[in-house]
């Protein structure tokens, strides 16, 4: 009897344990492996379609209309907030109805940069795609792969036949001009604790943090010099520099056209009393200036000596930066009666401002840049002077100190100084379960280890985490070279791994719970 009871008890315990374990076990719906080569082609197609839409920061109506039409074509409700962010929700496919909500995110705007010699209207003109092997870039100007390919991957994923739970595709506005869209996003828009931002630009890296940034603008107005007799105009044009992203590429110690402009102006003023007439240096605050054109007024008798001195300065830069291809164009001519010439007092004030600005890596810990500064653009037109300095750091306190310093500098020099924009630093010391899952899928897709990356460039998860403290978020994407320049190039062969890691995470996120 005792043995029989023991046997029955053992069977009952086993069956109960089996039932309990079955209740706890997550059963995924049947899944077929997508054709990632085809999915990649679809993502590139969607990207190039989106790239036909002009979309500089603060001018995104056409981009929103493009996404709205895409959503309505597929029967999905399109929404936008008061700032200009927009999104649509894709219902779960059959068998995935109980999966938790998931957010895919990218930004709509791009940094527009024309190729040397091109005169474009960024509100109307777009780049012409050129594809060669696994590379794609734009002719005439960049295509905006940052973050157009992220948008393209989102659109390709949700229109494919892969299984997934409910997905929100979120498209933020004005990221490149200060992350204003993310800063103005309502917390209710983040309807999931799982978010993947497809705004990365470096293969094999998974963002766990980013530097914060603050952009300062200093400006003033100067009357024109009255006496112009005996003066000639010397125009200096410099192009061909690498330029690049002022966060990602600053650690490469690339030559800035802003630095060259400041050096030449300072030298010519000290040696010849030259006065600046105009400056058009750099294009955007978050790009390393790769070109400049400016003119100075000098005594006609000094013209040849000035030209020789400029050549010597540029030659010295060429020796110091042998990897840069410096193209120069110098010309001398007459000054017209209506031409603007900055007076000596204005010239001194401009130089005092420019020489106090910082460029390049300021502090580095190991191989990681923790503090940096960029100078771009620099402008002087009809006496209106303006310069922007974008400082990045892992430490919010340092950026605030720099802001205080430059605001005080503006007061002391009697020029207008303003904080134009800023975004917070972000770091996630914990690798959350969703991020760990995606990291493993990404490692399998690439076949090598993934780097946990803290970017010197800013990314929008810094704001998303503030809206939802329990958010499990990361950012990654395919390799993009020379972002924020006309030479921007997308590596198409890096796209499949990003798609595979994203899709597999969507298909297995239910294993993490709500």
Where are these regions (language model features)?
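C-terminal motif of bacterial Sec signal peptides marking the signal peptidase cleavage site
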Residues: 17-21
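Active-site metal-coordination/substrate-binding segment of hydrolases
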Residues: 26-29, 96-193, 230-233, 347, ...
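Acidic/His- and Gly-rich active-site-bordering loop/insert found
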Residues: 27-135
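Zn-dependent metallopeptidase/amidohydrolase metal-coordination segment
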Residues: 35-39, 370-392, 439-504
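Acidic, glycine-rich active-site loops and adjacent beta-strand->loop/helix elements
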Residues: 108-110, 170-178, 199-203, 242, ...
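Midchain, well-structured core segments that form catalytic/ion-binding scaffolds
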Residues: 126-127, 132-137, 176-177, 182-392
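His/Asp/Glu-rich mid-to-C-terminal helical/loop segments that flank catalytic regions of hydrolases
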Residues: 188, 254-271, 300-306, 348-363, ...
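Active-site-adjacent substrate-binding region
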Residues: 249, 254-279, 403, 416, ...
